[in-house]
């Protein structure tokens, strides 16, 4: 049951309608029931593992708070939590790595419990917070709701205890503004997913299925299409998760802020998957020393963080290389930026000149798109082959015929218009509160909702040849 399905909307609306009229004492047990039902629908066989994880960490946190020698227990708890993640996610990968050393060991690839990468990080962050002095949660029901909240458990945002737990402990009734906000985010997410991400996926999947059949120009277009697809797909899920939570009076953190408007790779990660990047910053980068121990150590820390970020995404070398690429981009950016600023000063060019900002945005988008090739390719070898074909412009064709990539001409027109709308929304919304201003007028708000839903229904969910795709981050 995915957030863009009719079944999910029914589940969400009925759940919210039952939840709010309930007596205060009944709200939390009912919400836990909703969480359990939602998770069971996606993978009932993994529900006992989730329950065991929640119970173990609830009691471990209280023990951690009481004892004086905390480091040993924290290490044990983190090893057990991350070990469970590693068992399900990386066992087969470690077998492959051993094979590279000549040791032949056949290790099974276990089925991945849904949401385990996300709820494991939520729990590990909570345990580190307790180690650092946060009071351990005493109410098991509150802790269970915090770790299993259904809008966020599949693909985030990766929430923190200081933000989400107080909202769970003191439930708030959703008001009219919450309902309007929820509707806006659910509609926005549906449009991004159905009109943009799923149509872009057809282009991308066609090109990456057999790259040798396409020209360098077509593969370059597919690379750009994937950069846009994964943004629309993942931000769509985050929109729907944030909107769903608001129906229960709960505010989740924003996960994206116009990432392709970033002017550097460092800024990109301040705007992209914000809950994950801040998690790595607070629980790994800062403990490693951050930027406090000199430039060399800072850059090493950056590379470590990005390599592990890549590994978190998947058990394959291509993900590690993807992460390292972003780390290298940040290191090079950190080394070159002072020189570039001095050059601008010498030439009397303002660093914040509009045309210069545009150039930086384009370069950053290009670097991000390059890295995404490794993320999407079947392997690092395939990624290198695609890059080679793009760079050498093998089989370049003009004019570009995009119907080769699986979409009809009509679908391409719809996609083009939708992309223009997305780009304009991000450009304007990056500098001005676009959504708030546009939707201040009641009739305009409802007109926008109706138009977007109608276009999505005609050209997307019920349109000719519509091919629904699973959310990309569900595999992680």
Where are these regions (language model features)?
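Membrane-embedded transmembrane alpha-helical bundles that form the catalytic cores
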Residues: 1-425, 429-475
